[in-house]
């Protein structure tokens, strides 16, 4: 997991354009933070009223929590990268905040994979009942996912235990001991592997569902396939989000990690890999703004509760306007009488 906080490259002497790393990227993260906090706050409020009656709803609720926690790390990155905060902020990002960011990003990725598996099982294997579709199993699996991700990530916090050599130029890799640098590299490879496995499974599930829908349509040519088509579109939307938000970062991730931990890269190469990593990571962070849209299209109970809350709000507003109009009419009538 990349604990690089200041977006300065690790080995000196290397210099680069700070306009990108200290101004443009922090501003963009600030925009993502505000938008994501608003959308995920609303999503969390809506899901509070949605019963956990199905596996995929449980998985969606876990994604809401992961996105919200991930979004809370953005202000620290903004303060650290822009130089607006004290040097202790950069140390905190290296040791804690960046780890939380990546844990929650991969938790979200895994749960999207589980949602796709749930949809696949429901459509392609509808006659088979399985414990993996039970609510209790989904809750247990959710706990195991969080525990696994924390198990992989927490050593990055513990092993980032070296003192700060220069407060004006804090490099995250310099805060790690020897074992910490090795774990950093190994955990990166593990997390990247998890992503590519989930992404390939998404493609397999989507392909299988599409084939099933096509065969059902040829056999029946009835509206009974409309629900399956909707599920296919839902999984396609998840695949699309993966392609836009996560694939670019995971293409850039491995070469950037190697440039951090190996010494034979030129400054120009390090700079290029740094910019590639930062902008693709920003795309991954922007996923917290897209997930609430997926909730709306993927989860019917979510839509129902949202519509109910909106109608209640509109009703209260209309009642207030009617009450205000009645009071004004009563005042006018009393004035006319006088």
Swiss-Prot record:
Key words of the record: Cell membrane, Disulfide bond, G-protein coupled receptor, Glycoprotein, Membrane, Receptor, Transducer, Transmembrane, Transmembrane helix
Cellular localization per UniProt: Cell membrane
Gene Ontology MF terms in the entry: G protein-coupled purinergic nucleotide receptor activity
Disulphide bonds in the chain: 94-172
InterPro entries according to UniProt: GPCR_Rhodpsn, GPCR_Rhodpsn_7TM, P2Y14_rcpt
Residue positions with a glycan: 2-3
Coiled-coil regions listed: none
Extracellular side stretches: 1-29, 77-96, 161-188, 256-278
Keyword Lipid biosynthesis in record: no
Ranges facing Cytoplasmic side: 51-55, 118-139, 210-234, 300-338
Main location: membrane
Positions of transmembrane segments: 30-50, 56-76, 97-117, 140-160, 189-209, 235-255, 279-299
GO BP field: hematopoietic stem cell homeostasis
Membrane topology, record value: Multi-pass membrane protein
Cellular-component GO terms for this entry: plasma membrane
Job description of the protein: Receptor for UDP-glucose coupled to G-proteins.
Family in the record: Belongs to the G-protein coupled receptor 1 family.
UniProt xrefs under PANTHER family: P2Y PURINOCEPTOR 14 (PTHR24233:SF3), P2Y PURINOCEPTOR-RELATED G-PROTEIN COUPLED RECEPTOR (PTHR24233)
Name assigned to this protein: P2Y purinoceptor 14
Gene (UniProt): P2ry14
């Amino acid at each position: 997991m990349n604990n690089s906080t200041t977006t300065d490259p690790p080995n000196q002497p290397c210099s680069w354009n700070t306009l990108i790393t200290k101004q443009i990227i922090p501003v963009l993260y600030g925009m993502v933070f505000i938008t994501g906090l608003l959308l995920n706050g609303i999503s969390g409020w809506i899901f509070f009223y949605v019963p956990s009656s199905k596996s995929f709803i449980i998985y969606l609720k876990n994604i809401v929590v992961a996105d919200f926690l991930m979004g809370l790390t953005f202000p620290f990155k903004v303060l650290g990268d822009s130089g607006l905060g004290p040097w202790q902020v950069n140390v905190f990002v290296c040791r804690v905040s960046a780890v939380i960011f990546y844990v929650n990003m991969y938790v979200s990725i895994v749960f999207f994979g589980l949602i796709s598996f749930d949809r696949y099982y429901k459509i392609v294997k509808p006659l088979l009942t399985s414990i993996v579709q039970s609510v209790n199993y989904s809750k247990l699996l959710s706990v195991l996912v969080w525990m696994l991700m924390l198990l992989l990530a927490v050593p990055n916090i513990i092993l980032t235990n070296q003192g700060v050599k220069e407060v004006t130029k804090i490099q995250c890799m310099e805060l790690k001991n020897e074992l910490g640098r090795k774990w950093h590299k190994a955990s990166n490879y593990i997390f990247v592997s998890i992503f590519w496995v989930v992404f390939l499974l998404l493609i397999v599930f989507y392909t299988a569902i599409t084939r099933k829908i096509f065969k059902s349509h040829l056999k029946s040519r009835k509206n009974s396939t409309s629900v399956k088509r909707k599920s296919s579109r839902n999984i396609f939307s998840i695949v699309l989000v993966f392609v836009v938000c996560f694939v670019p970062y995971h293409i850039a991730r491995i070469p950037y990690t190697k440039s951090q931990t190996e010494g034979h890269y030129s400054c120009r190469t390090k700079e290029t890999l740094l910019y590639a990593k930062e902008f693709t990571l920003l795309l991954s962070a922007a996923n917290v703004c897209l997930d609430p849209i997926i909730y709306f299209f993927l989860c019917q109970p979510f839509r129902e509760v949202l519509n109910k809350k909106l109608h209640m709000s509109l009703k209260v507003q209309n009642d207030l306007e009617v009450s205000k109009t009645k009071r004004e009419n009563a005042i006018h009538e009393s004035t006319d009488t006088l």
